[in-house]
Amino acid sequence: MDKNHTTFENLALLEENLSPSSFSLMLYENAFSKIKLIQEIVKKQTLPVLFVDLDFLFSGYVKSQMLAIPNLSLFNTVESTITGILPKVLTKISTEPHLIIFDSINGLYNTLSNNADSGRVVNSILMLLGQNSKFSNSILVTFALAGKKDNNWVLPNGRQILENENMKKFFISDRSKITIEK
């Protein structure tokens, strides 16, 4: 991972907004820049990290020991189901604040692809995590591979991304520039 010398323009902007009880959505174009950004976020945090990895890229880096992160609890759907992961995450944040990284909304849709109401379930899960992280003074960061269509952020499967007044949206360009979305 050290061979990727990605530096992020405006990283301080992101760091200023990752505060207790915050809910941030990171929209990205490049999965490897996303992993490097996660590494930057995590190394500056003092909170224990709960990482829900639904696209398995981060898990691969951790399992191969290319990334070593202290205080990391890693969850993925290879080892459990989303319905098994959520109670564990909620229990952990009920006892102490954590940095919760939920990667990614795309992976959650894929996990729930057989559910006719997957859109509602995805939104409900995100709202549940958002509210519980707020009550526990945790920091919730979710990721989504997305692009703009008609001034709205949409996932590659065409679904529009949840809008929430409590959520801060950031865009990580392919050139690793971080901008805040209004």
Predicted regions, residues:
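Short, well-ordered secondary-structure micro-motifs
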Residues: 61-63, 111-113, 151-154
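Short, well-ordered alpha-helix to beta-strand connector turns
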Residues: 20-23, 45-46, 69-72, 96-97, ...
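Phosphate-binding/switch loop-helix module in NTP-utilizing enzymes
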Residues: 77-136
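Conserved nucleotide-binding/hydrolysis micro-motifs of P-loop NTPases
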Residues: 56-58, 79-80, 106-108, 146-149
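Phosphate-binding/switch region of NTP-binding enzymes
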Residues: 132-182
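Conserved P-loop
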Residues: 19-88
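Structural motif
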Residues: 25, 99-103, 141
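Pre-Walker A adenine-sensing motif
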Residues: 1-19
